[in-house]
Amino acid sequence: MMKKAIAAILYLFMAVTVSAQSGKTTAPASKNNPHLKVFNQSVMSGDVPSAVVALNYYVSDQGANTVYEDTLVMLYMQLGSYVQCYYWADKRSKLRPNDNNLLEMKGICLDKLQQPKEAIAVFEQLYSKTQNSYHAYKLMELQYGIKRLAECVATGMAVEKQTFKPEYTMTYNVGEQMGRTYLQAGIFNIHGLALYDLDRKAEAKQYFEKALVLDSTFMLAKQNLEAMKAIEAGAGKPKANNPSPGAPPANKQD
């Protein structure tokens, strides 16, 4: 984790340096500025919190500076400080409405801050602009999470027309364990869950099966399909042995 954090902050430092050299700053950065010296030192040591403090001082002293304000957005995201990240992402996106990275970080922050409706609005806008299948997947997650099921199915139908490459993958949690599968399989699984909750169970089963055709080890889809089969098997038994007819799939992807 420490190596990843250092790598991420070094990447940010290089991005800032390149942007500054290309003349994109609105307030020129001085290499001798004490706040930037602390920032650079913090970056090299992987000390993200100190880097954030240094940049806040620098931006406060120097006024608007596009490069370092954008960097604050990324650093706050790295720290998981979603209130602060949203503040800067929202501020910057008002000045740069076509910056999809800022828009995406706004949506992520809103999701983390338990504001799913607002996050959905952001990801709807983002997906309409980018047609990025990862943005569609996140939108489906959010829509399913607050039971906007018809919208979730509609998003699934739209994104499934796109071309998916084998390198499009995603991670997921099963209890304490983490798995990895194809992004398309994950989309099929959420699509199946939405169909199940809409009482379109035959179609839901087909989507879980489609996910498993892509990845037979995908545990979420496997558990959902097994739960459906168990419910179907129970429906044919004497009434005393029947499970609850409204029982949902065993595993839901939130």
Regions found by a protein language model. Name each.
Residues 71, 105, 138-139, 183, ...:
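Canonical tetratricopeptide repeat
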Residues 23-24, 178-254:
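Terminal, low-structured helical/coil segments at or just beyond the last alpha-helical repeat
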Residues 57-58, 91-92, 125-126, 159, ...:
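Canonical positions in the second alpha-helix
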Residues 18-71, 252-254:
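N-terminal leader/linker segments that initiate helical-solenoid repeat arrays
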Residues 44-45, 78-79, 112-113, 145-146, ...:
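Register position in tetratricopeptide repeats
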Residues 40, 74, 108, 141-142, ...:
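Residue-level recognition of tetratricopeptide repeat
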